[in-house]
């Protein structure tokens, strides 16, 4: 259906897609090892790539897949060694007519092999200027600027054109240099290893090199490992990275196993060490650093450690003395049965109630004290980068025992948390005292901590170095060799100078490690393994990390006596057994350990379970019978209370991230894919694929796959006998056994290799130099993490809030302040990090390499990619003028103040107080201006509260926000409200609190202060609700704050007052131009009576979930935030809550309702889909879309005349000729941010972060840039919409309707106070979720019991 817009020349709209080949067929062959050898496929892939860089080969578990395009000859392992004489287990071919939305396995494997081949040749041709980094390539420059990431994504369009998209992204990555390594640098930079992109942590070399030829080594450098040569050869053969073995420097690093297994580390604790502390040796040239968002180069090491004042030093000494004194009241053999908070009690009295932690509060610069409220906050301290790590890791290297399985440590991530300021709750273990100290730099109430400007941290535009990569004019001499010019410097090795600085014991004197208070011989986990036995280390682990008995109270740390437990002969208290998590669909519990020994009937949930093939009327979401990619398996990796068996632990392999295989939704995938062999660049693992070639309508999303993947035994079966019931190794495990466990866990078995007669190592030695002596770091060559698993930004100083199970209202308060802020908080200084396309290219390493690999390299334009481009009508909204309800165009919001418009659904009255500790006079003026503006615009009436005669009206001025003063203020508020209560409807009471800085730390702190007051008031007056509004102090004190700004602030206040669902306006429903009678079944097939919208997203670390709901007009609107943490059932509870909200919204509509389920970030995991399956019923039809405004697809506008307003910007004098004064009344005033066009693409696109799925229809809402020219084209602002299913047959019509609905909801952004006029192409509910997710992920949350 080609319907191009007549007014726009689509040939002038160019994309970042490049056509490579015209495909008639793709040939494939599958090879399996004869003897089930674990290494055969790995070796064949490496050897085949080494021999011919253009071969298309891919590895899946033990299977080797080979591909060829059109009539090219299929590659075969026999080409490497004819003596192998292997035959293909399966052969075939496929075309571009593949099934959607789930891609068949062979198609995804083909894309994976294609991308690997392109990256391999790019890296090799660039001579290490490009290095693969995750599923991208990092462009290494020779200056100190950040290095952009080059990302290439292949796609086979339905018109048989094989194309790739090329884009760049700047994460601020810098190569790690020896002379830049110091504790201050490590505490503010996250490290990653290439080519995998896995998060790592640097370890100081503790080996004694004195008297050896290694004396010159830097303290972080280690000698060349014995398998270093093998690793370098493997790097070159598999990735094209060529390092000089004579000049290569090596470092000891701790890889984050959770990240390796496909789950991003906790963003709010991103600088904390992982629980698994095993090390590997890696080339320094392949380690990169990403700066924290709040990095301050002027911060000294003493400031980072919080020891720059004499008072803080004395406080630490005093705490230590108090610890010694309190130890006299602890004796082994005693027990207690109470844990809780002991406030206001002498902690040294043996007669009072005791806690599991003695809480001591030293003096604080800000005089902040601990609060007894359920929700509190504390900015964390920034301790040394890895506190106590020199005591934890004292061995030279731990390569033999490096395991792929997740850590069995039962301790939480708090083991190495950074903490700061006076509210810190140390919940590490009962052996640790709470030492709350205020550290300079985090005084959120007073002094301002300097931070690097956002513009310096992230760059949205493509740097010159990336432009040169594509051969543009301004070429750098250092990179000239990339673009065909001669350059003698072809290696690019690092010759960094050795640093003289050292990290001493004094720097890490205050360790947050549990073992710091334990005997010296137990302080090192690896001591026993270092001496040939793991007994000592595992005993230490059993004691410190595994789940403890007796209410988690250590015997030697219980008090001498307790009034709460006085019977010395009674048995010790026993924990209440935890309920096993039950499936949403199956009433029977299922233990995966015994899966192979049970009936299929019970394995699938019994006779009452849902059948995977069950069909429903409205939406047929057929689901695989095998285990889904769920948060349960992923959360088990970081669970602190329950240790799962090793098989369950391995379920944490990536399920829903881009380009990771672990979807496990085809039969027995969890048994056939070793986690160590599951590489990121499997292109998102299509392996939840639908039936090949199946086209049973457009609602066959997530069909039961008929996989082509052979069923192989789980690699875990070979080591079942060596795994304990708790997932730990027995004490008798030797280092050789540990090595065997390790290699099996990654599917690498030297033992099997040597015992296999078909692969005699003696016979083939010399042919395959990679088959023996696998380095322990080999698994990190097999995985490539997607960029979606690396946060765009992170902070090394994160605020902390504490909530309990019954009251987490502070989270909703924070979300409300973030969303409805009219952008006066400036996104809390957290920048966007967009993907950027390449405007132009000429002869360079990319073009030359692609030209050498494929038959063409032609840029695609709109004539090929776009089916329809059309302007969208601006919707109308309802408002009141005097006493009449009128309709206006939605883009006239900024003229509301001049037209004396009123809210459509009535006024909202409130009374308020401004609570401040500075700028008293400015606040008084602010109160006057705010109240006058609110009343003048007829939003309602507002009353200034005066609690005492000494106070100014509407103002409470405190020198500081001590908890005692806040409680006194709460008592005054209670007294005032009790005295002045009326018999009528209560007027809402709001507190306005200014913030000195617009950052997440101060926002969290001020919200927690309000929570103290709110809890106290509600305790006395349960029916009283308090409301909060955070306003920047710059807004209050600035003389440039305009009346328009006050108007916007008043409207945002109106929108959050009760009833919160009532906003200033809503979309006015248009009278249809024609009536459609439902006289036939076909006419009513795709006609819905109402649409409701649900937008949601989960954070990349799976810690948070956000949702917003709306009807088509915005009359009904809700939003909610959930902190999931590491809980196994919180995700299901959140989904249930969302389900209830959606059903309640649908229940207010009549007739046939379509629920448009919108998932952000271009991804849809299986565990989420299983929950949403319930949302489809007889009267509710589910349309699933994935959306994102930051995609890897870009369009550049070269048209200078469309839209017509471009000419006004190109020539300011042209307005005199273009505008006719005599027809001035015929012109309309337009807001260009609201000038939106709809786009429906000719071919569907794959999801940006789930390349295993492809839309059945793709479209977008776009905005044109007013300053674009033919020579300087600008990219379109684009909100991409991918439709994944269609409840009826006309997907084109449904997508058009969804785009229209989204465009209407986007018009409410500025009216709801979500934005100040920007992002007019993003629907309000999507933008609300995006704002919450962008900011709240940087907040630590502790759940109080």
Swiss-Prot record:
The Polar residues compositionally biased stretches are 406-415, 486-501
Q: Which domain of life is it from?
A: Eukaryota
Q: Where in the cell is it found?
A: Nucleus
Composition-biased stretches, type Low complexity, lie in 364-375
- How far does the signal peptide extend, from start to end residue? none
Q: Name one GO molecular function term.
A: transcription coactivator activity
Q: Name one GO cellular component term.
A: mediator complex
Q: What is its main location?
A: nucleus
User: Which keywords label this protein?
Assistant: Activator, Nucleus, Repressor, Transcription, Transcription regulation
Alphabetical list of Pfam families matching this protein: Med13_C, Med13_N
In its keyword annotation, does this UniProt entry include Repressor?
yes
* Annotated stretches, region: Disordered: 363-387, 402-537
Compositional bias (Acidic residues) at which positions? Answer: 469-482
- What GO terms describe the biological role, i.e. biological process, of this protein? negative regulation of transcription by RNA polymerase II; positive regulation of transcription by RNA polymerase II
Xref: PANTHER family: MEDIATOR OF RNA POLYMERASE II TRANSCRIPTION SUBUNIT 13
The job of this chain, per UniProt, is described as: Component of the SRB8-11 complex. The SRB8-11 complex is a regulatory module of the Mediator complex which is itself involved in regulation of basal and activated RNA polymerase II-dependent transcription. The SRB8-11 complex may be involved in the transcriptional repression of a subset of genes regulated by Mediator. It may inhibit the association of the Mediator complex with RNA polymerase II to form the holoenzyme complex.
What is stated as this protein's family in its record?
Belongs to the Mediator complex subunit 13 family.
Its quaternary organisation is: Component of the SRB8-11 complex, which itself associates with the Mediator complex.
Q: This protein is called what?
A: Mediator of RNA polymerase II transcription subunit 13
Which species expresses this protein natively?
Candida glabrata (strain ATCC 2001 / BCRC 20586 / JCM 3761 / NBRC 0622 / NRRL Y-65 / CBS 138) (Yeast)
Q: Which gene is the coding source of this polypeptide chain?
A: SSN2
């Amino acid at each position: 259906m080609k319907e191009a817009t007549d007014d726009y020349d689509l040939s002038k709209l160019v994309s970042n897609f490049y056509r490579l080949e015209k495909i008639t067929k793709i040939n494939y062959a599958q090879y399996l090892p004869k003897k089930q050898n674990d290494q055969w496929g790995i070796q064949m892939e490496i050897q085949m790539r080494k021999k011919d860089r253009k071969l298309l080969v891919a590895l899946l578990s033990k299977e080797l897949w080979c591909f060829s395009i059109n009539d090219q000859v299929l590659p075969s392992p026999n080409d490497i060694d004819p003596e192998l004489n292997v035959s293909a287990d399966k052969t075939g071919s496929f075309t571009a007519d593949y099934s959607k939305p789930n891609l068949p396995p062979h198609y995804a494997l083909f894309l994976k092999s294609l991308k690997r081949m392109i990256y391999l040749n790019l890296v090799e041709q660039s001579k290490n200027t490009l290095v693969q980094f995750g599923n991208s390539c990092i462009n290494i420059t020779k200056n100190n600027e950040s290095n952009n990431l080059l990302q290439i994504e292949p796609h086979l369009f339905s018109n048989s054109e094989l194309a790739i998209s090329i884009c760049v992204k700047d994460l601020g990555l810098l190569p790690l240099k020896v002379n830049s390594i110091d504790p201050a640098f490590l505490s503010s930079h996250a490290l990653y290893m290439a080519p995998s992109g896995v998060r790592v942590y640097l370890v100081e070399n503790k080996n004694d090199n004195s008297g050896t030829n290694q004396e010159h080594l830097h303290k972080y450098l280690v000698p060349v490992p014995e398998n270093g040569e093998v690793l370098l050869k493997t790097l070159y053969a598999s990735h094209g990275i060529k390092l000089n073995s004579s000049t290569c420097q090596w470092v000891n690093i701790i890889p984050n196993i959770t990240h390796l297994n496909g789950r991003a580390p906790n963003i709010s604790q991103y600088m904390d060490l992982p629980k698994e502390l095993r090390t590997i040796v890696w080339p320094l040239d392949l380690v990169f650093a990403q700066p924290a968002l709040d990095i301050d180069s002027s911060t000294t090491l003493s400031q980072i450690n919080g020891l720059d004042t004499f008072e803080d030093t004395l406080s630490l000494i005093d705490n230590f003395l108090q610890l010694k004194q309190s130890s006299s009241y602890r004796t082994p053999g005693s027990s207690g049965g109470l844990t809780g908070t002991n406030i206001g009690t002498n902690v040294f009295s043996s007669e009072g109630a005791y806690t599991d932690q003695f809480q001591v509060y030293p003096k604080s610069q800000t005089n902040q004290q601990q609060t007894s409220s359920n929700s509190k906050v504390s900015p964390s301290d920034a301790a040394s980068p890895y506190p106590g790590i020199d005591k934890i890791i004292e061995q030279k290297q731990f390569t033999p025992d490096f395991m792929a399985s997740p850590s069995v440590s039962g301790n939480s991530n708090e083991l190495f948390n950074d903490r700061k300021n006076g509210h810190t709750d140390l919940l590490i273990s009962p052996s640790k005292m709470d030492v709350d100290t205020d550290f300079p730099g985090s005084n959120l109430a007073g002094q301002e901590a300097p931070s690097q400007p956002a513009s310096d941290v992230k760059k949205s535009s493509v740097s010159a170095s990336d432009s040169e990569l594509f051969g543009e004019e301004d070429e750098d001499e250092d990179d000239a060799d990339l673009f065909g010019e001669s350059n003698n410097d072809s290696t690019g090795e690092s010759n960094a100078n050795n640093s003289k600085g050292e990290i001493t014991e004094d720097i890490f004197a205050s360790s947050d490690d549990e073992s710091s208070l334990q005997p010296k011989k137990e302080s090192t986990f690896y001591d026993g393994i270092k001496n040939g036995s793991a007994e000592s280390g595992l005993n230490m682990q059993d004691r410190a990390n595994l789940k403890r008995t007796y209410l988690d109270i250590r015997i030697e740390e219980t008090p001498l006596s307790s009034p709460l437990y006085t019977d010395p002969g009674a048995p010790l208290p026993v924990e209440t057994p935890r309920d096993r998590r039950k499936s949403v669909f199956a009433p029977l519990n299922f233990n995966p350990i015994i899966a192979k020994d049970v009936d299929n009937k019970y394995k699938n949930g019994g006779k009452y379970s849902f059948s995977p093939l069950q069909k429903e009327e409205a939406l047929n979401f057929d689901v695989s019978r095998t285990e889904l990619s769920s948060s349960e398996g992923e959360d088990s990796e970081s669970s602190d209370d329950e240790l799962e068996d090793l098989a369950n632990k391995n379920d944490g392999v990536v399920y829903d991230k881009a380009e990771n295989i672990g979807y496990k939704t085809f039969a027995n995938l969890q048994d056939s894919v070793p986690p160590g062999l599951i590489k990121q660049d499997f292109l998102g693992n299509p392996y939840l694929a639908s039936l090949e070639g199946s086209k049973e309508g457009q609602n066959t999303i997530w069909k039961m796959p008929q996989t082509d993947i052979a069923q192989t035994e789980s690699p875990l079966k070979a080591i079942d006998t060596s795994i304990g019931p708790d997932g730990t190794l027995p004490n008798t495990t030797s280092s050789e056994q540990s090595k065997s466990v390790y290699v099996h866990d990654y599917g690498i078995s030297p033992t099997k290799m040597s015992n296999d007669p078909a692969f005699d190592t003696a016979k083939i030695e010399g042919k395959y130099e990679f088959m023996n002596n696998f380095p322990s770091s080999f698994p990190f060559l097999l995985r490539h993490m997607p960029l979606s698993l690396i946060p765009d930004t992170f902070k090394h100083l994160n605020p902390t809030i504490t909530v309990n199970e019954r009251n987490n209202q502070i989270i909703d308060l924070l979300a409300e302040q973030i969303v409805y802020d009219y952008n006066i908080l400036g996104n809390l200084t957290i920048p966007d990090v967009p993907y950027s396309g390449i405007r132009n290219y000429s002869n360079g390493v990319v073009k030359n390499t692609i030209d050498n690999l494929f038959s063409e390299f032609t840029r695609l334009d709109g004539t090929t990619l776009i089916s329809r481009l059309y302007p969208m009508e601006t919707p109308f909204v309802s408002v009141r003028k005097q006493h009449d309800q009128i309709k206006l165009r939605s883009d006239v919001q900024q003229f509301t103040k001049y037209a004396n418009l009123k809210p459509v659904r009535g006024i909202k009255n409130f009374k308020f107080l401004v609570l401040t500790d500075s700028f008293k006079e400015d606040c008084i003026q602010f109160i006057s201006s705010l109240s006058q503006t609110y009343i003048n615009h007829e939003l309602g009436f507002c009353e200034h509260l005066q609690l005492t005669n000494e106070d100014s009206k509407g103002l409470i001025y405190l020198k500081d926000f001590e908890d005692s003063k806040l409680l006194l203020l709460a008592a005054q508020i209670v007294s005032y409200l009790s005295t002045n209560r009326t018999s009528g409807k209560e007027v809402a009471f709001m507190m306005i609190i200014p913030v000195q800085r617009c950052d997440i730390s101060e926002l969290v702190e001020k919200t927690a202060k309000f929570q103290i007051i709110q809890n106290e008031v509600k305790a006395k007056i349960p029916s009283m609700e308090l409301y909060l509004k955070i306003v920047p102090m710059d807004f209050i004190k600035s003389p440039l704050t305009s009346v328009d700004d006050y108007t916007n602030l008043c409207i945002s206040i109106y929108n959050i007052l009760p009833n919160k669902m009532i906003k200033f306006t809503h979309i006015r429903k248009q009278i249809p131009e024609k009536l459609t009678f439902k006289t036939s079944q076909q006419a009513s097939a795709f006609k819905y009576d109402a649409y409701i919208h649900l937008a949601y997203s989960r954070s990349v670390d799976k810690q948070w979930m956000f949702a917003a709901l709306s009807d088509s007009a915005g009359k009904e609107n809700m939003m909610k935030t959930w902190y999931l943490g590491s809980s196994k059932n919180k995700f299901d509870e959140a989904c249930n809550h969302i389900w209830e909200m959606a059903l309640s919204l649908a229940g207010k509509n009549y007739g046939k309702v379509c629920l448009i389920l919108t998932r952000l970030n271009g991804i849809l995991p299986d565990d989420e889909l299983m929950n949403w399956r319930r949302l489809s019923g007889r009267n509710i039809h589910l349309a699933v879309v994935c959306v994102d405004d930051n995609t890897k697809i870009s369009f550049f506008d070269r048209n200078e005349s469309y839209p017509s307003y471009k000419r006004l910007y190109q020539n300011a004098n042209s307005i005199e000729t273009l505008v006719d004064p005599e027809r001035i009344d015929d012109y309309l005033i337009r807001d260009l941010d609201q000038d939106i066009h709809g786009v429906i693409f000719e071919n569907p696109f794959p999801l940006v972060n789930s390349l295993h799925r492809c839309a059945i229809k793709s479209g977008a809402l776009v905005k044109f840039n007013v300053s674009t020219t033919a020579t300087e084209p600008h990219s379109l602002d684009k909100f991409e919409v991918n439709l994944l299913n269609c409840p009826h047959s006309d997907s084109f019509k449904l997508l058009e309707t969804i785009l229209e609905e989204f465009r209407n909801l986007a018009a409410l952004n500025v009216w709801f106070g979500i934005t100040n006029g920007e992002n007019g192409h993003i629907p309000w509910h999507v933008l609300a979720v995006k704002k919450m997710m962008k900011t709240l992920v940087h907040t630590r949350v502790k759940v109080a019991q």
